[in-house]
Amino acid sequence: MASAIAKDAASPTVGSLPPPLLGKDRAGNEVDLAALRGKVVIVTFWASWCPPCRKELPVLGHFQRVVGRDALEIVAINYKEPRRTFTDLVRQNRDIDLTWVHDARGSVSDLYGVRSLPHMFMLDREGRVAYTHNGYSEEALPGIINEVLSLLPEEVRARPASNTASR
């Protein structure tokens, strides 16, 4: 299930390099995909008014914790909400360990051609789009987990915590 929004730009396609600058994190640091090369990166666009987004974020936070930031970076980009709403939501979800970015004007969302929420882009370790997903459902979760695991190096997949993520 996904929440629709109107957009005209095309989304980055599988195999392409997406726009590198994702905005600023909560500490004010620019999140640049070039600095994350060598890791699998998930970029997900979300909003507080999107019920599937609110279901997806805790799952992604758990996955981030299980795999570890040395191999996986999950960037959650808030879509066009007031700064106060964004900061309140991040504060309420402080136990979800993601890189939180606020896209107040929707400029990053526009560059990514986001048409519905949640909208996920999964990048391989070279920074290229490997998979994309629109919406969120419990049924799709095993496939998403397997996609992430397929992009991780063997030594990360062999870790005990990573093996439990695929069960």
Task: Name these PLM-found stretches.
Residues 122-167:
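Thiol-/selenol-based redox modules, centered on thioredoxin-like
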